[in-house]
Amino acid sequence: MPGRLIYLMGPSGSGKDSLIEAARRPLARLGCDVVRRVITRSAESVGEEAHGVSADEFERLERQGAFALCWRANGLAYGIPVQIDEWLASGRHVLINGSRAHLDQARQRYPELLAILLTVDIDVLRQRLMNRGRESAAQIEARLKRSALFSTEGGPVLGESVFFLDNSSELSVTLERFLKLLRSQGISAIQGRT
Protein backbone atom coordinates (compact mmCIF):
# COMPACT_ATOMS: atom_id res chain seq x y z
CA MET A 1 0.00 0.00 0.00
CA PRO A 2 1.49 3.37 -0.99
CA GLY A 3 2.35 5.97 1.61
CA ARG A 4 0.66 9.34 1.85
CA LEU A 5 2.08 12.77 1.14
CA ILE A 6 1.58 15.18 4.05
CA TYR A 7 1.63 18.69 2.61
CA LEU A 8 2.28 21.18 5.42
CA MET A 9 1.72 24.82 4.48
CA GLY A 10 1.68 28.11 6.29
CA PRO A 11 2.94 31.65 6.10
CA SER A 12 6.56 32.41 6.76
CA GLY A 13 6.85 32.73 10.54
CA SER A 14 3.95 30.38 11.29
CA GLY A 15 6.32 27.87 12.86
CA LYS A 16 6.43 25.17 10.18
CA ASP A 17 10.14 24.50 10.68
CA SER A 18 9.78 24.39 14.47
CA LEU A 19 6.84 21.99 14.19
CA ILE A 20 8.67 19.77 11.71
CA GLU A 21 11.73 19.61 13.95
CA ALA A 22 9.64 18.88 17.07
CA ALA A 23 7.72 16.18 15.19
CA ARG A 24 10.74 14.47 13.61
CA ARG A 25 11.01 11.53 16.10
CA PRO A 26 7.26 10.91 16.46
CA LEU A 27 6.95 11.06 12.66
CA ALA A 28 9.65 8.41 12.27
CA ARG A 29 7.62 6.13 14.53
CA LEU A 30 4.64 6.74 12.26
CA GLY A 31 6.65 5.67 9.22
CA CYS A 32 6.97 9.20 7.93
CA ASP A 33 10.06 10.69 6.30
CA VAL A 34 10.69 14.45 6.42
CA VAL A 35 11.98 15.81 3.12
CA ARG A 36 14.70 18.43 2.79
CA ARG A 37 13.66 21.10 0.31
CA VAL A 38 16.07 22.51 -2.24
CA ILE A 39 16.03 26.32 -2.01
CA THR A 40 17.88 29.08 -3.86
CA ARG A 41 19.49 30.59 -0.80
CA SER A 42 22.12 29.37 1.60
CA ALA A 43 21.02 26.73 4.08
CA GLU A 44 22.40 28.82 6.94
CA SER A 45 19.90 31.60 6.23
CA VAL A 46 16.93 29.35 5.64
CA GLY A 47 16.11 28.47 9.23
CA GLU A 48 15.19 24.96 8.18
CA GLU A 49 17.08 21.85 7.24
CA ALA A 50 17.25 22.59 3.52
CA HIS A 51 19.71 22.18 0.69
CA GLY A 52 20.77 25.63 -0.52
CA VAL A 53 21.71 26.00 -4.20
CA SER A 54 22.34 28.83 -6.64
CA ALA A 55 19.60 29.89 -9.06
CA ASP A 56 21.60 28.38 -11.95
CA GLU A 57 21.98 25.06 -10.13
CA PHE A 58 18.26 25.02 -9.33
CA GLU A 59 17.36 25.58 -12.98
CA ARG A 60 19.76 22.80 -14.03
CA LEU A 61 18.16 20.39 -11.52
CA GLU A 62 14.69 21.41 -12.68
CA ARG A 63 15.58 20.75 -16.35
CA GLN A 64 16.96 17.33 -15.39
CA GLY A 65 13.67 16.36 -13.70
CA ALA A 66 15.17 16.26 -10.21
CA PHE A 67 12.03 17.67 -8.58
CA ALA A 68 8.66 16.05 -7.99
CA LEU A 69 7.33 19.53 -7.22
CA CYS A 70 8.84 22.98 -7.58
CA TRP A 71 7.65 26.55 -7.33
CA ARG A 72 8.80 30.12 -6.96
CA ALA A 73 7.71 32.48 -4.20
CA ASN A 74 9.08 35.54 -2.43
CA GLY A 75 11.97 35.81 -4.89
CA LEU A 76 13.18 32.25 -4.24
CA ALA A 77 12.84 28.87 -5.95
CA TYR A 78 11.83 25.77 -3.99
CA GLY A 79 12.05 22.12 -5.04
CA ILE A 80 10.96 18.80 -3.57
CA PRO A 81 13.28 15.96 -4.68
CA VAL A 82 11.70 13.40 -7.01
CA GLN A 83 12.89 10.60 -4.68
CA ILE A 84 9.69 11.10 -2.68
CA ASP A 85 7.89 9.11 -5.38
CA GLU A 86 9.99 6.03 -4.53
CA TRP A 87 9.39 6.50 -0.80
CA LEU A 88 5.63 6.84 -1.28
CA ALA A 89 5.54 3.81 -3.59
CA SER A 90 7.36 1.75 -0.95
CA GLY A 91 4.68 2.57 1.64
CA ARG A 92 6.52 5.36 3.47
CA HIS A 93 4.59 8.49 4.38
CA VAL A 94 6.33 11.72 3.40
CA LEU A 95 6.06 15.17 5.00
CA ILE A 96 6.98 18.20 2.93
CA ASN A 97 7.04 21.90 3.68
CA GLY A 98 4.83 23.02 0.81
CA SER A 99 3.47 26.21 -0.70
CA ARG A 100 -0.09 27.40 -0.21
CA ALA A 101 -0.19 28.91 -3.69
CA HIS A 102 0.94 25.64 -5.29
CA LEU A 103 -1.37 23.23 -3.48
CA ASP A 104 -3.33 22.56 -6.69
CA GLN A 105 -0.10 21.58 -8.48
CA ALA A 106 0.69 19.14 -5.67
CA ARG A 107 -2.86 17.72 -5.72
CA GLN A 108 -2.60 17.05 -9.44
CA ARG A 109 0.42 14.83 -8.89
CA TYR A 110 -0.65 13.46 -5.47
CA PRO A 111 -4.48 13.43 -5.37
CA GLU A 112 -4.58 11.67 -1.98
CA LEU A 113 -2.29 14.14 -0.22
CA LEU A 114 -3.12 15.34 3.27
CA ALA A 115 -3.14 19.16 3.18
CA ILE A 116 -2.52 20.93 6.49
CA LEU A 117 -2.43 24.71 6.82
CA LEU A 118 -0.56 25.99 9.86
CA THR A 119 -2.19 29.23 10.97
CA VAL A 120 -1.15 31.85 13.49
CA ASP A 121 -2.66 35.02 14.90
CA ILE A 122 -1.59 38.00 12.76
CA ASP A 123 0.03 39.87 15.67
CA VAL A 124 1.97 36.76 16.70
CA LEU A 125 3.04 36.28 13.09
CA ARG A 126 4.23 39.88 12.77
CA GLN A 127 6.28 39.56 15.96
CA ARG A 128 7.85 36.28 14.85
CA LEU A 129 8.85 37.76 11.50
CA MET A 130 10.34 40.81 13.19
CA ASN A 131 12.23 38.66 15.72
CA ARG A 132 13.97 36.55 13.12
CA GLY A 133 15.36 39.67 11.43
CA ARG A 134 15.54 38.37 7.85
CA GLU A 135 13.21 40.92 6.24
CA SER A 136 12.62 44.65 6.25
CA ALA A 137 9.43 46.13 7.70
CA ALA A 138 8.06 46.51 4.16
CA GLN A 139 8.84 42.87 3.33
CA ILE A 140 7.16 41.75 6.54
CA GLU A 141 4.02 43.71 5.71
CA ALA A 142 4.01 42.20 2.20
CA ARG A 143 4.24 38.71 3.73
CA LEU A 144 1.38 39.52 6.12
CA LYS A 145 -0.74 40.76 3.22
CA ARG A 146 -0.01 37.57 1.26
CA SER A 147 -0.86 35.51 4.34
CA ALA A 148 -4.28 37.15 4.56
CA LEU A 149 -5.11 35.65 1.14
CA PHE A 150 -4.99 32.21 2.74
CA SER A 151 -7.37 32.67 5.63
CA THR A 152 -8.98 29.91 7.63
CA GLU A 153 -11.93 30.25 5.29
CA GLY A 154 -10.08 28.18 2.70
CA GLY A 155 -12.07 29.36 -0.25
CA PRO A 156 -11.09 29.13 -3.88
CA VAL A 157 -7.36 29.56 -3.23
CA LEU A 158 -6.95 26.49 -1.04
CA GLY A 159 -9.90 24.48 -2.29
CA GLU A 160 -11.41 21.69 -0.27
CA SER A 161 -9.99 19.16 2.15
CA VAL A 162 -7.55 21.40 3.96
CA PHE A 163 -7.05 20.87 7.68
CA PHE A 164 -6.29 23.99 9.71
CA LEU A 165 -3.90 23.82 12.64
CA ASP A 166 -3.44 26.88 14.87
CA ASN A 167 0.12 27.51 16.07
CA SER A 168 -0.45 30.75 17.97
CA SER A 169 0.34 29.23 21.36
CA GLU A 170 2.84 26.69 22.71
CA LEU A 171 4.58 24.43 20.21
CA SER A 172 3.93 21.37 22.39
CA VAL A 173 0.17 21.94 22.03
CA THR A 174 0.45 22.27 18.26
CA LEU A 175 2.62 19.14 18.08
CA GLU A 176 0.04 17.12 20.01
CA ARG A 177 -2.78 18.34 17.71
CA PHE A 178 -0.66 17.68 14.62
CA LEU A 179 0.08 14.07 15.59
CA LYS A 180 -3.57 13.49 16.55
CA LEU A 181 -4.65 14.81 13.14
CA LEU A 182 -2.21 12.51 11.34
CA ARG A 183 -3.47 9.47 13.24
CA SER A 184 -7.09 10.43 12.54
CA GLN A 185 -6.22 10.47 8.83
CA GLY A 186 -4.72 6.99 8.82
CA ILE A 187 -1.05 7.86 9.31
CA SER A 188 -0.20 5.11 11.75
CA ALA A 189 2.85 3.42 13.20
CA ILE A 190 4.74 0.84 11.23
CA GLN A 191 5.02 -2.52 12.97
CA GLY A 192 8.38 -2.99 14.62
CA ARG A 193 9.12 0.73 15.00
CA THR A 194 9.43 2.26 18.44
Please annotate each region the language model reported:
Residues P2-I6, G91:
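Pre-Walker A (Motif I) flank of P-loop NTPase domains
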Residues R25-V34:
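Post-Walker A helix-loop "phosphate-sensing" segment adjacent to the P-loop in P-loop NTPases
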Residues R37-V94, R100:
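ATP-dependent small-molecule kinase phosphotransfer cores
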